[in-house]
């Protein structure tokens, strides 16, 4: 056997093996590698999108939280203002009610003073009539002398 023939036959067998591999096996391997590369690229892109969405969600949540705090502060300020308005209104109403009560009490006092004066006038008129009757030693008829009593009462006023 000759080394040249063995070497040539092995070269031919290797060439057939390379042709078979490139024709039938290699396209499937390349397709599988490309699919895996595509899946890896898609996974990385999804990871990047997820990271960006997480950052956006974090920013949105901080904005919403900031807005909620601001709104809560506004509500507290409005509530405090409303409370002070209610207190001021209650004070004003109490003042008005107190003034009404005071005016009513003053009117009642004036009425009582007037009633007491009127009662005193009548008593003084009665005493004057009794005194006059004792002085004259005769009884004065109150009905007959009503005009006289009315004029005395008017003078006392």
Swiss-Prot record:
InterPro entries assigned to the protein according to its UniProt record, in alphabetical order: ATP_synth_B-like_membr_sf, ATP_synth_b/b'su_bac/chlpt, ATP_synth_F0_bsu_bac, ATP_synthase_B_chain
First-listed, main subcellular location of the protein, grouped into a coarse class: membrane
UniProt entry keywords in alphabetical sequence: ATP synthesis, Cell inner membrane, Cell membrane, CF(0), Hydrogen ion transport, Ion transport, Membrane, Transmembrane, Transmembrane helix, Transport
Compartment list: Cell inner membrane
Topology in membrane: Single-pass membrane protein
One GO MF term: proton-transporting ATPase activity, rotational mechanism
Transmembrane regions listed in the UniProt entry: 7-29
Domain of life according to the entry: Bacteria
A GO term from the CC aspect: proton-transporting ATP synthase complex
Signal sequence, renumbered to the chain: none
Record text on subunit structure and interactions: F-type ATPases have 2 components, F(1) - the catalytic core - and F(0) - the membrane proton channel. F(1) has five subunits: alpha(3), beta(3), gamma(1), delta(1), epsilon(1). F(0) has three main subunits: a(1), b(2) and c(10-14). The alpha and beta chains form an alternating ring which encloses part of the gamma chain. F(1) is attached to F(0) by a central stalk formed by the gamma and epsilon chains, while a peripheral stalk is formed by the delta and b chains.
Annotated function: F(1)F(0) ATP synthase produces ATP from ADP in the presence of a proton or sodium gradient. F-type ATPases consist of two structural domains, F(1) containing the extramembraneous catalytic core and F(0) containing the membrane proton channel, linked together by a central stalk and a peripheral stalk. During catalysis, ATP synthesis in the catalytic domain of F(1) is coupled via a rotary mechanism of the central stalk subunits to proton translocation.
Annotated family: Belongs to the ATPase B chain family.
HAMAP family xref list: ATP_synth_b_bprime
This protein's name: ATP synthase subunit b
Organism: Nitrosomonas eutropha (strain DSM 101675 / C91 / Nm57)
